[in-house]
Amino acid sequence: MVIMKAGSSRCAFSLGFLVGSCSLYVFLRQVWFEESFSWQSNGRSSPSPPISHEQNSSNLTWRVEGSALINLKHPNQPGEDGHIADELFKKVRILCWVMTGPSNLQSKAQHVKNTWSRHCNVVLFMSSEEDRSFPTVGLGTGEGRDQLYWKTIRAFHYALKNHGHEADWFLKADDDTFVVVDNLRWILSNYTPEQPIYFGKRFKPYTKQGYMSGGAGYVLSKEALRRFVEGFSTKVCTHTTPVEDLAMGQCLEKMGVLAGDSRDSLHRETFHPFIPEHHLTGKFSKTFWYWNYCYYPIVEGPQCCSDLAVSFHYVDPVLMYTLEYYTYHLRPFGYQHRYQPPVPAVLSLLSQTVKTTTETQRSEEGAKEKPALTNSVNPRAEEVQTTETSYKITNAAQERNTTHRSAG
């Protein structure tokens, strides 16, 4: 009997010691964060001198400023008509920061640098260590999954403090995420950066309004980012879990930031947490956790993904270049898109100018009796511009915009 009591006491002591140790660890990590984070806020440790050099000086498209890549103009292929995308590039400014690490710079981050990041206005590669040759921002954290939220907190603070004036929206993506930035711009053009809102692949557990998957990437308005940073200065938000995307969602919910609906008018998702083939071919087992996490009903097969898809996750370097080719180069001859979304309201004047110019060109071509097969888009396609689908998209975007304005 005495032996049993002694054993029970030892178990109770061990359990108490374990709980106390875990609590102390969390407390000390929080204290460490608050003290060590002062490198951002009070300038105790000044950043490295800025590096500035230009690429393609004969036809300048981007330059390096400090640890940032600045894309000076929207990239287009020779002979390509990208005037609408070019205008949105100027009016919907997106800062893209990419979560990476020293061991991933050449194996992963370099391929992001070569592909989709060229469509962002500002690009930052966030790492635990500074690398001025790549370049990366050194966040002064460790590496590993338990460091993801630390890196995210510091990265967003850094982005707002150092580049807040250069962007309206702030996208977080991993170094194995592929993003179609131009499609993201179209979604964001229906909102304003003054609205406290963010978008991504919406999950539902553990928060009232849901939260956005970290792997698929998520984008914050400038006001949402301001509130996120404020949440830490007021201690409304703290680092209590290493689960980055969930902790992010919980903080933003506390700060009154709305979790936006980024689906298209046909309720197809735009942000995707897996590679395209997993969504398109229905490879998800019914016991897979994904079924219990998705905020909206899962659709498998060809209708899984919007024609204006924004992102895919777990993309290896080969697939990164493949998706870049499929997105910006591959075209089937003789076909129009299933629907052509309406030009955003912010570009309505440009749209009218383009329409007038197109009609003038069409008249001139008719007068010259050019052959039917030309290198331009089929003129008749523009005469059938407003389809039932595009009408629904316009209404859906306007309704969401009105709703979010009221909520903001």
Curated annotation (Swiss-Prot):
Its cofactor is Mn(2+). One of its GO terms (molecular function) is metal ion binding. Signal peptide: none annotated. A glycoprotein binds at W289. UDP binds at M99, E143, G144, R145, K151, D174, H313, Y314. The keyword RNA-binding does not apply. Residues 1-12 are cytoplasmic. It is an enzyme of class 2 (transferase). It is found in: Membrane. Pathway: Protein modification; protein glycosylation. Disulfide bonds join C96-C120, C237-C251, C304-C305. Belongs to the glycosyltransferase 31 family. Beta3-Gal-T subfamily. This is Glycoprotein-N-acetylgalactosamine 3-beta-galactosyltransferase 1-A. The lineage of its organism: Eukaryota, Metazoa, Chordata, Craniata, Vertebrata. The gene is c1galt1la.
